[in-house]
């Protein structure tokens, strides 16, 4: 993507809550804001065209 590898790791190595879209740690099992357990890994590719 053109960023430094350290920045890529910090920005993209996250989990996203499917209910409230909060960013969570990669090792999280529940959302830190709402407690929901359905977390997805953040997309590594941008959605833009």
Swiss-Prot record:
Which is an annotated GO molecular function term of this record? structural constituent of ribosome
Q: Which family, according to UniProt?
A: Belongs to the eukaryotic ribosomal protein eL40 family.
Q: Which named protein is this?
A: Large ribosomal subunit protein eL40
Q: Which organism is it from?
A: Methanosarcina barkeri (strain Fusaro / DSM 804)
* Bilayer-crossing regions: none
According to the UniProt record, which cysteines are disulfide-bonded?
Answer: none
Q: What PANTHER family does this protein's entry cite?
A: 50S RIBOSOMAL PROTEIN L40E, LARGE RIBOSOMAL SUBUNIT PROTEIN EL40
Write the gene name.
rpl40e
Write down the Pfam families for this protein, in alphabetical order: Ribosomal_L40e (PF01020)
One of the GO biological process terms: translation
